[in-house]
Each structure stands twice: as structure tokens, then as C-alpha cells.
Amino acid sequence: LVLLGIRDQSQFPLIFYRENCADMALCEDDIDPAFIADAACVCATGTHLSHPRTEAAVLKALRLAREGGARTALDIDYRPNLWGVAGHGDGESRFVESQKVTAKLQSTLHLFDLIVGTEEEFHIAGGSTDTLEALKAVRTVSNATLVCKRGPMGAVVFPDEIPASLDDGESGEGFPIEVFNVLGAGDGFMAGLFRGWLRGEDWPTTLKYANACGAFAVSRHG
């Protein structure tokens, strides 16, 4: 359950109530090897690494995917209150430093072919509030392609080494739209990104899909 407020184009206070919710009841026994074997990609969310039971399920799914040749992706999706480092009323908060969260994320980053997050989400994954330093820290533990979302500025991709500037990555511009509701922006972005990535499109085209889907999501209510 989410209680969402909309103050203006930049403030969306919300309260998460996620006590004993269905997705956090996921366990290893729920992971069907046959289902994973039929998948082209397994995408995990960072939230499900926050609890030992769901983490075990995620790790099993990733192991099966990698053994079967499927691609693996991580949406860092860092929500401090869902990791227990912020209160229920801090649902709008996107970043709280936590060595515990950073260590947990870094212990799994090597399992992914693609890692996606905002600058703040890479800060928690990399253990630094300097975006480039955070990306470099992630690169030391993972060879994944890194996709950094930059809101209205679009997104930038780092397939290999991290350059001296964010602007030196493979960039995709955002779409100028009126923002109504930011909830669902990340899900929309991932959907567009997967459409291009899984079909072997080039990064400019893939980022155009991703940014367009994210823009559609935030430009309407509901």
C-alpha cells in the first residue's frame, strides 16, 4: 500500500506500508527452474536483497539464469525506508548513506550483465556521494553495463571503463514533458530499456525507448 501526495512537479510525498506484503514472502521454493530456463532475462530489484528470505530467492533465480545462458539485470531501486534505514514517512527519500546496504549490494553486483540506477542509487551501490567515484567502485566489482538515469537529462550508459565525465558516456536525451506523477517512472524506463537491450538495438535507440517510456509514465496520473 502506498499513500501518495502530489504537491507540485517536484514534490511527491508518500508513505509505504509494506508489512508482510506478498512479494516479500518470496522464498527459494517459489523459484521454478523450468520457468527460469524459458526466460531471456531475469531482472532483480535491490529491494528484494534487503531480506534474507527474498535475497535467497533472488540469488537462486540469478544462478539458474546464468547457468541457462539468460541475461541478468538489476534495478537498484533503492528506497531507504524499505531497507530499515529511514522511517515509513520517508518514502520520498531516495538516499540515506548506509555501509550495510552498500556492502549487501556490492556482494551481488558481479552476478549481473546490466545494472540500472539513478545517480543516488549508484551512490549507495558504490559507497560514495560522488557519482563518478561511485560508478568506478561498482566497476571494480562488476563487469556489467551500467545505466545511470539522470531524470530530465535522460540517461547515460557505461559499457566498459568509467570515463572522466558523465557526459563522456553514451548518452540518451530525455523528453521535455510536464510531470504529473513520478511513481512508475523507473518501471517504464526499464521496460523501454529491455525492449532495446534484449533485441540487440544500439544504445542511442535503446535509451530513446527507455526515456520515452519513462516520460509517458510521469506525464499522467495513475
Give the label of every model feature segment.
Residues 1-46:
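Conserved N-terminal subdomain of the carbohydrate kinase-like
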Residues 20-29, 94-99, 128, 172-174:
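Short gly/ser/thr-rich secondary-structure transition/capping motifs
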Residues 22, 46-50, 214, 219-220:
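Glycine-rich phosphate/pyrophosphate-binding beta-alpha loops
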Residues 32, 105, 179:
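Acidic, amphipathic alpha-helical patches
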Residues 33-36, 109, 140, 200:
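Alpha-helix termination/capping residues and helix-transition junctions
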Residues 41-137, 144, 152-155, 160:
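Conserved beta-alpha-beta core of the PfkB/ribokinase-like small-molecule kinase fold
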Residues 63-67, 100, 127-222:
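Conserved phosphate-binding/catalytic region of the ribokinase-like
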